Amino acid sequence: MSYNEFSRTSAPRRRLAQVSPSTTALRIYQCPANKACRIDAIYVSNIHSGVTDITIHHLAPGETATTSNAMYYQVSVPKNTVLIDDAPKYLLAGDTIMASSSTGAHVVITVYGEEG
């Protein structure tokens, strides 16, 4: 399936990944080989009793998580809050989404989308 064949209503979104990142960048999701992927939504839930910062990266194959590929860099998430990014993101085969949290394992990140 090419990117042109994706539409926001072509298939129900499904959970692609769910992780609780630590203070070092952790792979959340990697688009499989020979696939194109669409991320429909990223949910960030702060399950900690205080504010925590998150950083989320979109990496091409062979890249490492740095400030130059951060989609969100040290974004503060208040306690008991869910941040929702529902803007579509398109990944090529081997592209990776990684994340870290300032307080380690105090947020849950859930990724919804489609592999085509």
Predicted regions and their residues:
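Short solvent-exposed strand-capping/beta-turn motif centered on an Asx-Ser/Thr pair
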Residues: 44-49, 102
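Short edge-strand/loop segments of extracellular domains
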Residues: 59-64, 116
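C-terminal interaction-tip segments
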Residues: 1-36, 101-116
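Beta-strand signatures of extracellular beta-sandwich domains
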Residues: 55-59, 110-112
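Acidic glycine-/aspartate-rich tracts in secreted/extracellular proteins
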Residues: 47-50, 61-63
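Short, solvent-exposed loop/turn segments enriched in Ser/Thr/Gly
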Residues: 35-41, 90-93
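Intrinsically disordered, low-complexity Pro/Gly/Ser/Thr-rich segments with frequent PxxP/GP/PP motifs
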Residues: 62-96
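Hydrophobic beta-strand residues in large extracellular and virion-surface proteins
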Residues: 28, 54-56, 97
